[in-house]
Amino acid sequence: MKVFISHAYTDESFVRKVAAGLEKVGLEVWDATREILPGDNWADKISQALQESEAMVVLLTPDALRSSSVRWEIEYALGQQGYRERLIPVLVGNPEELPKEDVPWILRRLHMIDMGEYAEEEEGINQIAQVLLEAA
């Protein structure tokens, strides 16, 4: 299964960890930090990746919620039958910086993974991978 990771550019270090964890269990990950090269048309690359992907992990941080790109990617996934049951919102960071109430209502109705509930980052990343494997 090809997985698109939607995130704010400020969260790239965590994105790399998530991508590595998903690839470790055999999932194919599309990540803008690796796939978009200097000179590439950013919008075209994102559009193509969204069309080719079968699942989306949305890393929800304060910066991601302010990002028009992340909002657009979420709207795309919500409108596509292929992403049904395969849109995974992930709350990242301090709950005081991003209370669940700040997450758009449409994402709150989905099962959300809260990284703050795991003692180790790796445990949360493993949970993301498990949910995706079950949805495959």
Q: What does each model-identified segment do?
A:
Residues 1-59, 78-86, 92-95, 118-136:
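Conserved N-terminal substructure of TIR/SEFIR domains
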Residues 65-71:
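Active-site-adjacent loop/helix micro-motif of nuclease/hydrolase catalytic cores
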Residues 112-117:
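Short acidic-hydrophobic, aromatic-tinged amphipathic segments that line or gate anion-handling sites
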Residues 1-3, 108-111:
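Short amphipathic alpha-helical segments
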Residues 95-108:
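Glycine-rich, charge-decorated loop segments at or immediately adjacent to ligand/cofactor-binding or catalytic sites
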